[in-house]
């Protein structure tokens, strides 16, 4: 049986269906901007093999360039700030949704690792502890007796391996950790803590799906207890949604300390980076969903607060 890897500086989190905010707001936030690339029709590879492009998977183009990665004001694993250069790339406007993942499964017959193992990581509120819940899957995030996953919410209970399989099918890949942070910063060397600014909320209006209240008495000031529809909290300056909170997101890289950081972590190619933070309680608080916030988990682990978005290489426009 797989082990849930709970070894990061962050307290690893969870995700699923939740209370709905204004339908009008969600609809407004789902409208594509002029710098969003829509890719809804199949393409052909140079080998003349069909490459499927997932439906409604709008992507945002970044020219690439250099930026200062990390934060001197963040957690120890975010230091030191160091210069990184990324090449031009596209990244999905939003995390992959339940609906998009369902099409992948229907076309390919793919089985996630949670389905193969027969369980997946869920936080048990009654017992106030994590558990491997039998039957918890991407389509039944709280197990067979729980509600169905909602189509427009980010897919969860997917391992890094599952995410890579989807990305390969869609003719894409997972973003590198540097690409993810560059996109979260809207391609700028901004000093803002979050993808949207410096505050989690202003006058009771929340900018992301995050945890409120103590772990044993959760509140829903942002309108959701668990996951929210992608885009429900608007976009960053670059036109991306959910670049902080809602669900943790897998990155392509294995986890390692930044250059010059003596963090006592042995590099393991099977331990992958996750970014974004999620809707669930985190001991590191707001630092988990800061643009520089980073954590890790094993490549075969699936949790109900972890999903992903895709990226792909691009030529400079």
Q: For each predicted feature, which ranges?
A:
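Sec-dependent N-terminal signal peptides
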Residues: 4-12
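Short, compositionally biased
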Residues: 16-136, 140-141, 161, 188, ...
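Functional-site microenvironments in short loops/helix caps that host divalent-cation chemistry
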Residues: 25, 61-62, 68, 73, ...
């Amino acid at each position: 049986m797989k082990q849930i890897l709970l070894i990061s500086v962050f307290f690893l989190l969870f995700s699923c269906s939740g209370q709905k905010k204004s339908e009008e707001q969600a609809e407004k936030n789902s409208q594509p901007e002029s710098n969003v690339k829509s890719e809804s029709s199949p393409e052909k590879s140079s080998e003349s093999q069909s490459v499927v492009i997932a439906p409604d998977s709008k992507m945002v183009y970044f020219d690439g360039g250099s930026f200062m990665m990390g934060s001197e004001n963040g957690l120890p694993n975010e230091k030191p700030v160091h210069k990184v250069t990324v090449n031009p790339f596209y990244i999905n406007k939003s995390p992959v949704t339940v609906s998009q993942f369902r099409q992948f499964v229907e076309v390919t017959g793919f089985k996630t690792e949670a389905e193969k193992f027969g369980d997946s990581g869920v936080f048990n509120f009654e017992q106030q502890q994590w558990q491997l819940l039998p039957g918890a899957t991407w389509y039944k995030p709280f197990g067979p007796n729980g509600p169905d996953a909602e189509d427009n919410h980010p897919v969860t209970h997917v391992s890094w391996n599952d995410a890579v399989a989807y990305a390969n099918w869609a003719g894409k890949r997972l973003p590198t950790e540097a690409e993810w942070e560059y996109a979260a910063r809207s391609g700028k060397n901004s000093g803002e803590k979050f993808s949207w600014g410096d505050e989690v909320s202003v006058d009771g209006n929340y900018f992301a799906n995050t945890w409120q209240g103590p772990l044993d008495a959760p509140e829903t000031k942002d309108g959701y207890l668990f996951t929210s529809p992608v885009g429900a909290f608007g976009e960053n300056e670059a036109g991306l949604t959910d670049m902080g909170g809602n669900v943790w997101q897998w990155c392509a890289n294995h986890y390692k300390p930044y250059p010059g950081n003596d963090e006592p972590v042995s590099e393991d190619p099977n331990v992958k980076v996750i970014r974004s933070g999620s809707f669930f309680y985190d001991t590191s608080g707001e630092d988990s969903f800061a643009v520089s916030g980073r954590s890790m988990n094993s490549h075969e682990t699936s949790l109900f607060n972890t999903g992903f978005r895709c990226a792909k290489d691009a030529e400079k426009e």
